[in-house]
Amino acid sequence: MRTLRFYKAVPGGNPTILILDPVPAGDRAVVSRVLMGAGHLQAEQVGFLDLAVRPVRLDMMGGEFCGNACRAAAAVMAREASGLSPHEGGLRGELSVSGAEAPVGVRVEGGECWAQMPLPGEPGLGVTELGPGLGLVRLPGISHICLDEELHPFPGDFAGAAEGLRTRLDVEAEAVGCIWYRANPSCAIKPVVWVRSTASTHFETGCGSGSLALALWLGKGQNFPTDLKVLQPSGNPIGVRLEESGPIRRAWIHGPVDLVARGEAFV
């Protein structure tokens, strides 16, 4: 049995466990499955956070990228006074994270945690139209299938439906989300996310990268600049900001993050 220090965060839903002690890469999937289980801490995902390096390093349980986990990491970094510097009344820094080729920006300001989201370098920002109300958005570290709920109703067996969509559309990635959405009268999503290494499928109560994927899909990758609020199954919104400065385009997600527990877990 090993003892692992942890934080549990809720970034707009999407309960996330962040482990602060080293866990070998080959053990992370097994440890994550235990921690997420009903008989343990329970969560929708697990990340492994190294506060001792610069920039601070976050490795997700399956090597995927997760924007909400980056926001949760920013909240922990602020609480631990690690890796962030004062800036215009808030805190800013960088985070090295699995699934992203370069460090991403994080900031804590105005009661919200922000995470920069890596964008595809390809034309159209990884957005592909597959059919009426059906699109694919390939982001670094995760791909999302976007489905208009009016044309593609949310299924009772969401895990089976998500598996069928991945197979039929031949979507290969470390993590794949199926994002059922509605755009009117306001944007809302029902995200189902599968992670390859843990063989886990969750109907997530919040999904930051899925919210970004929806914003890109609705604008076909061309809607810069944009500010969009996307309602999550938790009942909380996640904000998406798309910025453009000359040829440079950036994307951020933002919203409150609640740190609900910290302590030691026995695995």
Region locations from a protein language model:
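Surface-exposed beta-loop interaction hotspot
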Residues: 115-158
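A glycine-rich beta-to-alpha transition motif near the start of alpha/beta enzyme domains, typified by
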Residues: 1-111, 143-267
